[in-house]
């Protein structure tokens, strides 16, 4: 008997142990990401050829305690390597695990390599050569918790590579993951009609057809790890291969299971057909190009097993939620008696099906953790948490309170916005506590920002509510789902407001009181324009004529644009970010503003203020400053807290202000308290102007910011 380890993705252990038991392996023991077992050589060959779940089979040669480099060397040296491969063979070592005396895997691999070549030399043979690529023999070593396991890769390249895939689709599903979906769904135990309406490159259907037609998944592989092993029994292997070929030929002829696959992408359907042809099962599968929402169930009952799109890219979530909701509705109405098994990485999406799962499992698609849910669709399946919607009822009724509120807000604000001369404004700001989101309109696009929920509310509840919001929005305010972008906003910490989210850009040009600004709805947490400061920017513009204007913590320079359009004598725009200064320059160009009177300065604003306060000639007539609530950026010398530091900050700013000048000071700290007493002693006059700077669309949230007009006393 030989000792083996079958490696597999996390979550496969139970299924793999069951498969090995069915093969006849013994001493089966589940471990992390794999299963140990023993088997005679012939059975090991059969398992390697027929396993549908394992990623790799390794022959365990040594396993024992290891507490020093010397012990590691001795463990490898004591193995009679010449019994496993010739010195004419090349070899490589994959070492996994660190800890204790092993600081890095390269050190461990080097020790084992030295032991192997020394053993060959001491036995009177020439040393074998190491090959980093395509070695004849691959040694796998694992060090964990003071135990070293040394093994030989018995199966060769990853067993999920069956050999039938020509190229992959955009998001390929690994073959052994598809096989595990078929096993855990219950389909493999009783093969029946199978439908995949998001078939992509056909992996689920092809794996199912291979099972139903009794075709060994490794039959088309061109290489196995044991081929250069000295104990390889070519005759036994040939016999097992020929038996598998005969079973495959007979199995295809006898298979009476019906398979149906469709995808909206004709290129993927063509690819699926090529893959099925390569696998020898094309005649068993009916492929067609179709929208999943238009696919009709085949006659009778069966299984629908699929891996639908779950869009990892920001901004596609609303459209996908609509798709999942419509799928759930279709399943309920048209697939009575069927079983559905669905793999998805996003709990919000899969919950949008509004179906009660019989079973929920975890699987990993590569490093991506996914939910694998099983559903039984009874003739009168009901939606979870929601009454069945009668014909003609709007989808918004799944969140009626939210839908009614935002519909009312939108109706009121649309006329106001047109009159104001703006096309970007806030529609909803957590008006109903259960729906803790902000919804902003930017022309014909919508941005939904989720606020961080209190810790007392279960995550599943917040996700369901967010899902309902995104489902209700299109019907409630008449917006296309693909024009809804979703973002998650937490309480501001340091420079969170500048966190980059996505390389993809969705850029628009918005108009505000005659000024034009570039927006990026997807690249950053904020879009490039703080809508709550709309009136503050207009106020800056109104106060700027003939004045020298300074804009600090300028972000994308929108206040600077208003100042320039308002007739400022000069405008100095200061921000630490080159990205935002470049954006500010674009905003100036959009408004046909150019000239030496417009200066852009990249600097740590606090340090720039300190330095400028020492320069008596640095005088400004109007200063606008909107500092972060808190910042500890690595590029800033010190941390900044607006409550703690505002007196010191204003004390420096007043030195930059001309005798009749004004400072417009704003911040977003909700419980900010201006230290008027200390400032008065410094001969600084302070006036709160919140009433002048709170726009109508923010009246529901009067603490969104606080604004002050500051002058010399």
UniProtKB/Swiss-Prot annotation:
Swiss-Prot/TrEMBL keywords:
Cytoplasm, Methyltransferase, RNA-binding, rRNA processing, S-adenosyl-L-methionine, Transferase
Give the CC-aspect GO terms: cytoplasm
Q: What is its EC number?
A: 2.1.1.173, 2.1.1.264
Enumerate the subcellular locations listed in this protein's record, separating them with semicolons: Cytoplasm
Q: Does the keyword Cytoplasm apply?
A: yes
* GO molecular function terms attached to this record: 23S rRNA (guanine(2445)-N(2))-methyltransferase activity; RNA binding; rRNA (guanine-N7-)-methyltransferase activity
Q: Which domain of life is it from?
A: Bacteria
Report the residue ranges that make up the THUMP domain in this protein.
43-154
Decide whether keyword Membrane is in the record: no
Where it mainly occurs, coarsely classed, is cytoplasm
Name of one Pfam family that matches? RlmL_1st
Query: Which reaction(s) are listed as its catalytic activity?
Result: guanosine(2445) in 23S rRNA + S-adenosyl-L-methionine = N(2)-methylguanosine(2445) in 23S rRNA + S-adenosyl-L-homocysteine + H(+); guanosine(2069) in 23S rRNA + S-adenosyl-L-methionine = N(2)-methylguanosine(2069) in 23S rRNA + S-adenosyl-L-homocysteine + H(+)
User: Which class of enzymes does this protein belong to?
Assistant: transferase
Task of the protein: Specifically methylates the guanine in position 2445 (m2G2445) and the guanine in position 2069 (m7G2069) of 23S rRNA.
**HAMAP family attached to this UniProt entry:** 23SrRNA_methyltr_KL
* Family under the similarity heading: Belongs to the methyltransferase superfamily. RlmKL family.
Q: Which protein is depicted?
A: Ribosomal RNA large subunit methyltransferase K/L
Which species is this record about? Shewanella sp. (strain MR-7)
By which gene is this protein encoded?
rlmL
């Amino acid at each position: 008997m030989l000792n083996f380890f079958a490696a597999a993705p996390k979550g496969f252990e139970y299924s793999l142990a069951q498969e090995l038991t069915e093969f006849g392996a013994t001493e089966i023991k589940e471990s992390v990401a794999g299963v140990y077992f023993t088997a005679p050589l012939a059975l090991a060959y059969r398992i390697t050829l027929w396993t549908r779940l394992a990623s790799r089979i390794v022959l365990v040669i040594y396993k024992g305690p290891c507490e020093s480099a010397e012990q590691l060397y001795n463990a490898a040296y004591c193995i009679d390597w010449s019994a496993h491969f010739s010195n004419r063979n090349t070899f490589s070592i994959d070492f996994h695990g660190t800890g204790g005396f092993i600081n890095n895997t390269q050190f461990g691999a080097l020790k084992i390599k030295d032991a192997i070549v020394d053993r060959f030399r001491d036995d009177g043979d020439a040393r074998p050569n190491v090959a980093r690529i395509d070695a004849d023999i691959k040694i796998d070593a694992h060090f964990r918790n003071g135990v070293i396991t040394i093994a030989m890769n018995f199966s060769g390249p990853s067993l999920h590579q069956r050999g039938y895939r020509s190229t992959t689709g955009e998001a390929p599903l690994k073959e052994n993951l598809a096989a595990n979906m078929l096993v855990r769904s219950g389909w493999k135990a009783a093969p029946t009609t199978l439908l995949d309406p998001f078939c992509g490159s056909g992996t689920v259907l092809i794996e199912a057809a291979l099972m139903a037609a009794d075709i060994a998944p490794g039959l088309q592989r061109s290489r196995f790890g044991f081929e250069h092993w000295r104990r390889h029994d070519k005759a036994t292997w040939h016999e097992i291969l020929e038996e598998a070929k005969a079973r495959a030929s007979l199995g295809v002829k006898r298979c009476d299971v019906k398979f149906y696959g469709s995808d909206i992408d004709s290129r993927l359907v063509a690819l699926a057909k090529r893959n099925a042809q390569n696998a020898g099962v094309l005649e068993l599968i009916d492929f067609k190009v179709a929208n999943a929402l238009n696919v009709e169930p085949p006659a009778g009952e069966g299984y629908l097993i699929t891996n639908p799109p779950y869009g990892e890219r920001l901004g596609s979530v609303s459209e996908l939620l609509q798709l999942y909701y419509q799928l759930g509705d279709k399943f309920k109405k048209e697939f009575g008696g069927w079983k559905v098994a669905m793999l998805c990485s996003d709990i919000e999406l899969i919950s949008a099906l509004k179906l009660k799962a019989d079973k929920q499992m975890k699987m990993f698609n590569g490093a991506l953790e996914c939910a694998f849910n099983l559903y039984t669709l009874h003739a009168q399946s009901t939606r979870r948490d929601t009454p069945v919607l009668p014909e003609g009822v709007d989808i918004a009724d799944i969140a009626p309170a939210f839908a009614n509120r935002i519909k009312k807000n939108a109706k009121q604000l649309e006329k106001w916005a047109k009159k104001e001369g703006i096309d970007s404004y806030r529609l909803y700001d957590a008006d109903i506590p259960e729906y803790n989101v902000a919804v902003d309109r930017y022309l014909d696009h919508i941005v939904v920002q989720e606020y961080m929920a209190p810790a007392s509310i279960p995550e599943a509840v917040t996700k369901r509510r967010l899902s309902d919001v995104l489902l209700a929005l299109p019907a409630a305010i008449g917006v296309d789902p693909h024009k809804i972008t979703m973002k998650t906003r937490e309480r501001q910490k340091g420079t969170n407001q500048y966190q980059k989210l996505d390389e993809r850009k969705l850029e628009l040009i918005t108009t505000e009181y005659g000024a034009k600004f570039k927006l990026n709805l997807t690249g950053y947490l904020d879009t490039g324009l703080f809508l709550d400061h709309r009136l503050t920017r207009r106020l800056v513009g109104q106060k700027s004529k003939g004045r020298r204007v300074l804009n600090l913590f300028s972000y994308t320079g929108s206040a600077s644009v208003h100042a320039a359009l308002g007739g400022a004598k000069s405008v100095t725009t200061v921000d630490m970010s080159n990205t935002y200064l470049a954006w500010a320059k674009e905003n100036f160009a959009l408004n046909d503003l150019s000239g030496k009177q417009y200066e852009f300065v990249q600097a740590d604003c606090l340090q720039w203020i300190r330095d400028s306060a020492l320069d008596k000639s640095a005088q400004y007539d109007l200063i606008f400053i909107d500092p972060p609530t808190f910042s500890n950026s690595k590029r800033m010398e010190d941390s900044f807290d607006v409550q703690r530091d505002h007196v010191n900050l204003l004390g420096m700013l007043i030195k930059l202000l001309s005798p009749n000048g004004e400072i417009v000071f704003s911040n977003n700290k909700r419980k900010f308290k201006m230290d008027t007493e200390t400032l008065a002693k410094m001969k600084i006059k302070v006036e709160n102007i919140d009433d002048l700077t709170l726009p109508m669309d923010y009246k529901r949230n009067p603490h969104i910011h606080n604004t002050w007009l500051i002058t010399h006393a």
